[in-house]
Regions:
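Cleavable N-terminal export/targeting peptides
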Residues: 1-31
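Gram-negative and organellar
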Residues: 25-389
C-alpha cells in the first residue's frame, strides 16, 4: 500500500490596500472588503484513510489514503433591506491506491433575501453541482458522476414575533448522470416541490405549525416505475430558548402515488431536531426522521427511519470535541431487502490560531442487510487543517 503524500503547509500573505480592508469576527473567518462586497476565502487540507471507500462487501472492499484540497470562496453584500451571497467550492480528492477514483467536485450557489417591510420577505436561490461519488453506484469499479441544477424561491408573510406567519417555498431540480454505458441513467429526473407552512404563536417562545408538501418526481426514462407524486401533511411545534432547549417537531402522514404502478404507499412521517444546552459551552443534539426517499438498486423507493444523537463540548476557547451516533432502518420498496445502518463518530479540534484549526476524527459505519452482498463495514480516519484570513 502506498504511503500518503506529506501535506504541505502554505503561508499566505494578504496585502490590504486602497478600498480593501480586513473584517474579523470572533470565531468566524475574516473577510476582505472589496468596494462594498465582503470576500471570504477559506482552505481545508485533509488526509484520510478509508478502508472501504466504495462501500462494498467485506470480501470486495478497497482501501486507500486520500488527500483533499478544498478551497471555498464567498462573496456577499448587504443593504438595509436585502442580502446577496455567491459561494463557490471546489474539492480535489486524490486516491493514492486507486487513481481511477480521483476526482474534483464543483459546487456553485447563489442566495438572496429581499425584505420589503417587517411583514413581507422574498428569498431565492440558484445552484449547480458537478459531483463524483465513490459509493452509491451500480458500477463498483468507477465513480458515479452526476450534475445537479436547482432554482428555488420562497415568500414569507408576517413578522416572526407576530401572532401568525405564512411561509411558502417552491424548488425545481434537474439531476443528470454522466457515467459511461448509461449507468444510472434510470435515475435521471426533474423534481418540482412546494412546501407551505402556517405558524401560530402560542407563547413568547413557542409556535404551533401546520405544513403541506407536494413533490413531483418526473423521471426521464419512459415508464420508469419511480415516477411519482409525493404529498404530506404535518403538524408540529417550534420553540426557542425554552428551558435551555431549541427545536422543531413535525409529525403527520406521507403518501407516494406511483404513475406507472397500481402501488400507492402511505405511512406516518415525522421530523424532529432538538438542541439542549446544559451549559453555554456544551450542546446535545437529537434529530430523527421517518420518510420516503427516492429509490436506487432497482428499488422504486426507500422507506427510511433514522435517528442521530450528538454531543459537542468546548473544553476551552481552543479545544472542542464531538461525539455522535446514528441508526437507520431502510426498507427497499419493490425488493425483498431491508438494511440496518449504524454510524459512530468522534472528533477533536484545536484552534492553533484564530485563522488555523486542526481537526482529527474517526467514523465507523456498519451496514447489515438481508441481501448478504450489500452488508459492509467502513472505517475512516481523518486529519485536517482549516485555514482562513
Amino acid at each position: 500500500m502506498k504511503r500518503p503524500m506529506v501535506l504541505a503547509t502554505t503561508l499566505f500573505t494578504t496585502t490590504v490596500a486602497g478600498s480593501m480592508s480586513l473584517h474579523v469576527s470572533a470565531g468566524e473567518p475574516a473577510s476582505i472588503n472589496l468596494a462594498g462586497f465582503d470576500f471570504t476565502p477559506t482552505l481545508k487540507l485533509s488526509e484520510r484513510y478509508d478502508d472501504n471507500f466504495r462501500g462494498l462487501n467485506n470480501d470486495e472492499k478497497k482501501s486507500s489514503w486520500i488527500s483533499s484540497i478544498h478551497p471555498s470562496f464567498i462573496l456577499e453584500a448587504e443593504t438595509r433591506n436585502s442580502g446577496y451571497q455567491l459561494q463557490y467550492d471546489v474539492d480535489n480528492q486524490t486516491y493514492h491506491d486507486d487513481p481511477s477514483a480521483n476526482h474534483t467536485d464543483h459546487i456553485l450557489a447563489f442566495r438572496s433575501v429581499l425584505e420589503f417591510n417587517s411583514r413581507n420577505r422574498l428569498r431565492y436561490d440558484l445552484g449547480y453541482k458537478r459531483l463524483e461519488q465513490t459509493v452509491d453506484t451500480a458500477d463498483n469499479v468507477d465513480n458515479d458522476r452526476l450534475t445537479i441544477k436547482n432554482a428555488g424561491a420562497g415568500y414569507t408573510y408576517g413578522s416572526f414575533q407576530g401572532l401568525n406567519q405564512l411561509d411558502g417555498h417552491v424548488d425545481y431540480e434537474q439531476r443528470r448522470y454522466l457515467n459511461p454505458n448509461g449507468v444510472n441513467d434510470d435515475r435521471e429526473r426533474n423534481t418540482t416541490a412546494f412546501v407551505g407552512t402556517w405558524y401560530h404563536r402560542l407563547t413568547g417562545k413557542t409556535r404551533a405549525l401546520t405544513e403541506v408538501r407536494y413533490t413531483d418526481f418526473d423521471y426521464l426514462q419512459s415508464h420508469n416505475p419511480r415516477t411519482s407524486i409525493g404529498t404530506a401533511a404535518l403538524v408540529g411545534l417550534s420553540w426557542e430558548a425554552t428551558a435551555r432547549t431549541t427545536g422543531t417537531l413535525r409529525i403527520g402522514e406521507e403518501r407516494k402515488d406511483f404513475n406507472d404502478s397500481a402501488r400507492d404507499d402511505r405511512s406516518p412521517t415525522w421530523e424532529a431536531g432538538i438542541d439542549w444546552k446544559p451549559l453555554t459551552y456544551s450542546t446535545v443534539s437529537l434529530s430523527t426522521r421517518k420518510a420516503y426517499d427516492e429509490g436506487n438498486d432497482d428499488a422504486i423507493a426507500i422507506h427510511q427511519q433514522k435517528t442521530r444523537l450528538g454531543w459537542k463540548h468546548e473544553w476551552s476557547s481552543r479545544i472542542a470535541t464531538e461525539l455522535n451516533a446514528s441508526h437507520a432502518d431502510l426498507e427497499y420498496e419493490g425488493l425483498d431487502r431491508e438494511d440496518r445502518t449504524n454510524v459512530y463518530g468522534t472528533s477533536v479540534s484545536y484552534a492553533v490560531r484564530r485563522w488555523v484549526t486542526v481537526k482529527t476524527s474517526y467514523q465507523h459505519t456498519r451496514n447489515e442487510s438481508t441481501e448478504s452482498t450489500e452488508a459492509y463495514t467502513r472505517n475512516i480516519y481523518l486529519l485536517s487543517f482549516d485555514f482562513s484570513l
